[in-house]
Curated annotation (Swiss-Prot):
Homooctamer; tetramer of dimers. It is found in: Cytoplasm. This is Pyridoxine 5'-phosphate synthase. It comes from Laribacter hongkongensis (strain HLHK9). The gene is pdxJ. GO terms for molecular function: pyridoxine 5'-phosphate synthase activity. GO terms for cellular component: cytosol.
Length: 244
């Protein structure tokens, strides 16, 4: 079984472009759930460029599946997570100047801080995931922090400019997923996945969940939000079924 986490950040981006109350990220999340989303992902960035603080509690109370909060490794974000108590937290690297998350968390470099955050979040019943590059040493370090989940960064695969590079990156993702599962980790993946490139990743049996946002929101402008979610989920399920 492959799960779909729908990232609703860019619904908030559209809302914030005009400073209005619409479109509502919460309404989008509820539509996504009815269309087959298994969880809702949102990223409260330090610059609040899309999701705002007020969105968190409303989202937590409204959705019926799981809330996956992406957050930077800062005390402010830890406090927010401990206040809202999402079911899941994914710790991600963050740079103010980037358009979107550009790479994986350096777990080896920030090991002690990550382990401390992980302990505090888990003490409140929150499942902790670390967003990392598909690298053996980062996976092993992630396991040693006490985190039970890793999310593999698929950006290099998604942005590959040639078939050979794409296949090389897919092999890295597949190998990393096997390493993670062998260590007892739950392995998720995401970043840059679209309707055109999702199936090879969804076919990797060791991967439990894919988190996808921009492609779904963009496609929703043409076909509607629920159909966009259903189409993505169908592609994922088809790929996993064919790989079985």
């Amino acid at each position: 079984m492959i799960l779909l986490g729908v990232n609703i950040d860019h619904v908030a981006t559209l809302r914030n472009a005009r400073g209005t109350r619409y479109p509502s990220p919460v309404e989008a999340a509820l539509v996504a759930e009815t269309a087959g989303a298994d969880l809702i992902t949102l990223h409260l960035r330090e610059d609040r460029r899309h999701i705002k603080d007020d969105d968190l509690a409303v989202m937590r109370a409204a959705i019926k599946t799981r809330m996956n909060l992406e957050m930077a490794l800062t005390d402010e974000m830890l406090d927010n997570a401990l206040r809202v108590l999402p079911q899941d937290v994914c710790i991600v690297p963050e740079k103010r100047e980037e358009l979107t998350t550009e790479g994986g968390l350096d777990v080896i470099r920030y090991f002690d801080r990550i382990a401390d955050f992980t302990r505090q979040l888990q003490a409140k019943g929150i499942r902790v995931s670390l967003f990392i590059d598909p690298d053996d040493e980062q996976i092993k370090a992630s396991h040693e922090t006490g985190a039970t989940v890793v999310e593999l960064h698929t950006g290099r695969y998604a942005d590959a400019e040639s078939h050979d590079i794409r296949q090389r990156e897919l092999t890295r993702i597949r190998h990393a997923a096997i390493v993670g599962v062998d260590l007892g980790l739950v392995v998720n993946a995401g970043h840059g996945l679209s309707y055109h490139n999702v199936q090879p990743v969804a076919a990797i049996r060791e991967i439990r969940e894919l988190n996808i946002g921009h492609a779904i929101v963009a496609h929703a402008l043409m076909v509607g939000f629920a159909p966009a979610v259903r189409e993505m989920k169908a592609l994922m399920v088809e790929a996993r079924h064919n790989a079985a």
